[in-house]
Amino acid sequence: MKAQLLTIGDELLIGQTTNTNAAWLGGRLSRLGVRMTRTVTVGDAREAIFRELDRAYEEARLVICTGGLGPTHDDLTRTVIADYFGAPLQTDPDVLERVRQYYDRRNRDVPPSAPALAQRPEGFETLDNPVGAAVGLWHEAPDGRLIVLLPGIPEEMTAIFEASVQPRLEEQSGVGEVRHRTLVTAGIGETALQEKLGDLSDVLGDDVSLAYLPSTSGVRLRLSADARQTTAGARLDTVEAAIRERAGDDIIGTGDVTLEAVLGDALRARDATIASAESATGGLIGHRLTGVSGSSDYYLGSVVAYANSAKKTVLGVDEAAIREHGAVSEAVAVQMAEGVREALGTTVGVSTTGIAGPTGGTPDKPVGTVWVGYADASERHARRHQFVEDRTLNKELFASAALEEARRTLSV
């Protein structure tokens, strides 16, 4: 099944809001075996929405639109859809009652514009919104083409998709034509990974494709095969085995696994605990570790020691080490890791001290420099990394480097 996505809203075009809906839907549809062929973003303009809707509906069997389902004057999706299909808008009394109950539960007056939320084009089915007021809409044409309308608020969009859209799609013919398998790596960049894997053309053949999907925590390798072929599963197994043989312990798992979850499993398997001493990452390591359910089994806490005075008084870093080597140095990173390990009584301590930028760099320590420290009962070391010039991106990369340092050291 081919699909196209139309995301609607001026806020998306001007960069006021990040279009997370497109990324989320693309990933979810891909896992369902739906082939996304095009994604378009348009503003709150009737003609633009109509034009892009017409193109998508002509080219794809499934069209998903997000945004423009609210009750305000710039929420145009319902009326454009009604015009496109020549279907008059109707008020659904059941939806209208649910809208009233939604506001009553929150002790809020029902706004005069709220009844617009209960309108739907004739022939469309409503999809209940378990977390908001704006319902989704579903339409299946006699020729099997599908159009789905979802709210633009990400939490509402995902809730409706998971509860109502995905189950319906799974019943459709043509879904699952593409079979994917994702291998997750850590601690190696895209270029280095490509060089390590070498030429895979003989292994891939003509029936399996490989895509490199880099992120701040590693590179995902997505294998794709035609699910209609009876050999698809076996071929994916063969290619995966070849990649694992070449990549070794750079591969940390499959599917949606995360670096922090894999590290957590390694700690739990060893009945070990961890704490982080963070300077440049400002608590991001702790944030990522606590994003894993059950992380209280092994994560005890963090010390954000941004100033040199905090490094000395809280973590016990030597004044002489800072004076001789600087705060961004191997010696300080090691002492920070050991200091937080002793302070919190953990098995493992990790640390980051670096220059996230955009200022603060020197010829010897340019922006993007970070030292990652590691300490346990028998091992104390630090490793230097050089990343980019963007502050936000560097913080993510620094945190990933620390998590990966702990994972690799524990796996030895």
UniProtKB/Swiss-Prot annotation:
Which protein is depicted?
Answer: CinA-like protein
Q: Which NCBIfam families match?
A: cinA_nterm, PncC_domain, PRK00549.1
Report the InterPro entries cross-referenced here.
Answer: CinA, CinA-like_C, CinA_C, CinA_KH, Competence-induced_CinA, MoaB/Mog-like_dom_sf, MoaB/Mog_dom
| Family classification | Belongs to the CinA family.
Superkingdom of the organism of origin:
Bacteria
Name any one Pfam family assigned in the record: CinA_KH
Q: Which organism is it from?
A: Salinibacter ruber (strain DSM 13855 / M31)
Q: Which HAMAP family match?
A: CinA_B (MF_00226_B)
